[in-house]
From Swiss-Prot:
Catalytic activity, as annotated: L-glutamate + ATP = L-glutamyl 5-phosphate + ADP
Species of the source: Synechococcus sp. (strain JA-2-3B'a(2-13))
Protein name: Glutamate 5-kinase
UniProt GO MF annotations: ATP binding; glutamate 5-kinase activity; RNA binding
Compartmental location: Cytoplasm
Role according to the record: Catalyzes the transfer of a phosphate group to glutamate to form L-glutamate 5-phosphate.
Record lineage: Bacteria, Bacillati, Cyanobacteriota, Cyanophyceae, Synechococcales
Gene from which the chain derives: proB
One CC-aspect GO term: cytosol
């Protein structure tokens, strides 16, 4: 049984798990990782492992030298690899008498509120039982529009869901740099990132391996999601899993992202990062100030443009005049209705729409600001 409230989510990527040339699993990494996570569990930490590698393992099993690009092939190869991957984890953890559970998620499990809550309850029960859940995206059934796209985002959403204290992103570099150190000799290491301080990095240039789907840009997105939920995030070298206890003890290893001082509520986090926006609203400067600085609801008068087609209750992006996304929210009107009442005063809504609508386009209770 768990003896502490501290939950640690560890994500290991394909580039750390597998050989970049052959796609074969690196047992020299997996073995120490399993030992470290088991040790943490016995110390009283609640531990969740988010593991990539199913496609890479599947390719190796089939003798493929390159990662497939066709969706059907990727899903089939993932089905081949996931079974072998979880079997290996079970063998390694069983040798240390540590029970594990396989948890395969799709984006749809987090989009629908009832499924989100149920997934959270399942994690809570597993952790209470002293089990280490091993999480991966269910690539075999996930449709392209509802994919996480990378396990960095998945790990951050899981950390947010279970209200973890730590998210450790194990990758193929020691830490975050201002640019790709392999290409730019002036690249500077970044030791710590504080909330609210702009981060100047060339994340897109810090690439990914041929077997993975992530990169440094996806890890920054993951850090944004997790820190908004009050989670401390660390990016560090996946080939050194033995450093994880030292990180939890406060040693300056890798790049640390400090959590937001006032984490958003679970519902606001679900709106901001769990849902998939179906459109966007462009706001004028006054509406941006009202929403972002004064914590007010969005009125139709502050909307200058609508993009996309959606119904009332859909999730949408809220953008400033330059197109920068500043918030997400659940709309009270459809896209067609909003096009009729954008820029109009609240008192004019009944005359324009022909019925007594609500005053707000997005109520502040259904609106979540982004970092």
């Amino acid at each position: 049984m768990a003896t502490t409230d501290v939950t640690v989510v560890v994500k290991i990527g394909t580039s750390s798990l597998t050989d970049t040339q052959t796609g074969l699993l690196r047992l020299s990494v997996l073995g120490p990782l399993v030992e470290v996570l088991t040790h943490l569990r016995r110390q009283g930490y609640a531990v969740i492992l988010v593991s990539s590698g199913a496609v890479g393992v599947g390719c190796a099993r089939l003798g493929w030298r390159q990662r497939p690009t066709a969706i059907a092939e990727k899903q089939a190869v993932a089905a081949v690899g996931q079974g072998r991957l979880i079997r290996l984890y079970d063998d390694l953890f069983s040798a240390l008498n540590q029970p594990i559970a396989q948890v395969l998620l799709t984006r749809g499990d987090l989009v629908e509120r009832s499924r989100y809550v149920n997934a959270n309850r399942t994690f809570a029960q597993l952790l209470q039982m002293g089990v280490i859940p091993i999480v991966n995206e269910n690539d075999t059934v996930a449709v392209e529009e509802l994919k996480f796209g990378d396990n960095d985002s998945l790990s951050a959403l899981v950390a947010s869901m279970v209200q973890a204290k730590w998210l450790i992103l194990l990758t193929d570099v020691d830490k975050l740099y201002s640019a790709d150190p392999n290409r730019d000799p002036s690249a500077q290491p970044i030791e710590r990132v504080l909330p609210g301080i702009p981060l100047q990095v060339k994340a897109e240039a810090q690439g990914k391996s041929g077997w993975g789907t992530g990169g440094m840009a996806t890890k920054l997105t993951a850090a944004q999601i997790a820190t908004a939920a009050g989670v401390t995030v660390v990016i560090t070298n996946g080939k050194r899993p033995e450093q994880i206890p030292a990180i939890l003890a406060g040693e300056a290893i890798g790049t640390r992202f400090d959590p937001a001082p006032q984490p958003a509520s679970a519902r606001k986090r679900w709106i901001a990062y769990g849902l998939i926006p179906e459109g966007s609203l462009t706001l004028d400067e006054g509406a941006v100030r009202a929403v972002c600085e004064q914590g007010r609801s969005l009125l139709p008068a502050g909307i200058t443009a609508i993009s996309g087609e959606f119904e009332a209750g859909a999730a949408v992006r809220l953008c400033d005049p330059s197109g920068q996304e500043v918030a997400r929210g659940l709309v009270n009107y459809s896209a067609e209705e909003l096009r009729q009442i954008k820029g109009k005063k609240t008192a004019e809504i009944p005359r324009i729409l022909g019925y007594e609508g609500v005053d707000t386009a997005v109520h502040r209770d259904n609106l979540a600001l982004l970092n």
